[in-house]
UniProtKB/Swiss-Prot annotation:
Keywords, in A-Z order: Magnesium, Metal-binding, Nucleotidyltransferase, Transferase
Catalytic activity: dTTP + alpha-D-glucose 1-phosphate + H(+) = dTDP-alpha-D-glucose + diphosphate
Transmembrane segments: none
Bound cofactor: record note: Binds 1 Mg(2+) ion per subunit.
Superkingdom field: Bacteria
Entry's family note: Belongs to the glucose-1-phosphate thymidylyltransferase family.
Positions annotated to bind dTDP-alpha-D-glucose: G8, K23, Q24, Q80, G85, D108, N109, G143, E158, K159, V169, D222
Protein's name in the database: Glucose-1-phosphate thymidylyltransferase
Cofactors required: Mg(2+)
Amino acid sequence: MRGIILAGGSGTRLHPLTIGVSKQLLPVYDKPLVYYPLSTLIMAGIRDILVITTPADAPAFRRLLGDGSDFGVNLSYAAQNEPEGLAQAFLIGADHIGNDTVALALGDNIFYGPGLGTSLRRFEHVSGGAIFAYWVANPSAYGVVEFDADGKAVSLEEKPKTPKSHYAVPGLYFYDNTVIDIARSLKKSARGEYEITEVNQIYLNRGQLSVEVLARGTAWLDTGTFDSLLDASDFVRTIELRQGLKVGAPEEIAWRAGFIDDDQLATRAKELLKSGYGHYLLQLLDRE
């Protein structure tokens, strides 16, 4: 399976913060935002990842993430010249995907919960599409999925004014290779975008879409507004101070997955000692 992190867009809802820097490079407590979706893909066992950014932001992402070797993955980069919808990621990333399955993680979404990594690895050989549903108070801000009395998904809508349910679709999607042809067949919506909801609707119409409700106790944080960005930082800070364990540290997750060894973790840690982040990584070696 190949991975894609979509970290483009103009971030207008966060202006003036994002006039000079990509939204996905903003801090969420002690880490840049993009570390969290990167961690999610590593938890899913994915080692070949394409990072899609704006042309202007590409150098900063390369400086931060490099070739991925610090995290035991292979990172490549592509430019999204104009933000034309989430499904555009499959057009930009078609060569990266090749004949493989693919996971798309939105660069501003954070996932946290018990057993998340084990759960995500199930989709490595996905047939059709697999998405998630998460109960939210304000579904009109998201893509919304409706279930029938038997818990079967029956409809999908993108940011509806009158939602048919409170179940939003988070920014993590798994697809088989058909998604490339589906994306190529799309026409732009009234918003001028290639909609991910339409991709999911096509899979649903074919009877090939799995929709799984995220378990209670799993947190999904969307950081697209000032308040949600601050809420995400507060959430991460609270857990880390309470437990003494990092949330969304890709080096730790890669090490636990066997993507990097003890020596590689120690080398990375020594580069980050002054902030305390490196000390945390070194302590992992002492604890285990």
